[in-house]
Each structure stands twice: as C-alpha cells, then as structure tokens.
Amino acid sequence: MSNHVIVIEETFNAPVEKVWEALTDKDKMKQWYFNLDDFKAEKGFQFSFPGQGHKGEQYIHLCEVTIAEPLQKLQYSWQYKDYEGYSTVTFELFDEGDQTRLKLTHEGLDSFPQHPDFAVDSFRGGWTHLMTISLKDYLNKVS
C-alpha cells in the first residue's frame, strides 16, 4: 500500500445506525468533526468548511459526495480552495451487532503541494484524533 494512503480502522460500541448518523447528520457532525453549514449524504452534494494549518493558516476544504450507501459506505472528494490536488475520503461501516467497525481510507494525498500542512503525517494525525478520540467520545456519549 502506498505511503500516500491512510487507512484507519476503529471499532465503536454503537450500532451501525448511530455511527452512520454521526457521519451524515450535520448537527451531529459538528459535535465531533468540522463545523459544516450543511451536509447531505447524497451523491453530488457539495460542501465546504474552513480549517486551520499548523501555523494558523486558513484553508477552505472543498468536498463533493461521490458515494452514499446508507449504513455501509460514504465517500467524498477532498480538495483545498486555491491549491492543486484531489483526494478522496471513504468511510466503510461494518455492522457487528452492538458494535460497528469503521474503516477510513484517505487516498490521493500525493497530489497535494509539498507543504507541512499537506504532509501524510499531518493527515494521519488529524484522522487518528478524529476517529480514536473525537468520534469515539461522541458515540460513547450518545449510545
């Protein structure tokens, strides 16, 4: 597997329906993910949100849902306004009864400019925090 691909798997003590809601309901997403103005798990839906780099730089994330299979798979493009590069983020859900295994894959990272904020380690750190701390804490609260 390319070192420009991030794969993180985490098992949550929550049914697949709760995990899907956390990934697709904008009000729930705001509690663990990013502050999105709107989000719909529908192919073709476009959304954007601000983010901050290591030194305070502001970035606008530009995304479009490319796959939305309820309770199974969500994928969207991930780009930055005014920067080259195109990547995809995929969330795959595996129903394990009272638990859900979630596999996150972020591909295409080598298409971004050579910059510390776009480094694979930066993305890996961000996704690891979101999956193993933010989302896990959120689901533990609501399940």
Where are the regions that the model predicts?
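A short gly/proline-enriched turn/hairpin at secondary-structure junctions
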Residues: 6, 30-37, 49-55, 77-79
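Hydrophobic pocket/interface hotspot
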Residues: 19, 29, 47, 65, ...
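Hydrophobic-ligand binding "helix-grip"
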Residues: 38, 55-99, 107-110
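Hydrophobic ligand-binding cavity/cleft-lining segments
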Residues: 1-38
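Residues at helix-coil transition
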Residues: 24-25, 70, 132, 140
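Tryptophan-centric aromatic hotspots in well-structured domains and transmembrane helices
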Residues: 20-23, 32, 78, 91, ...
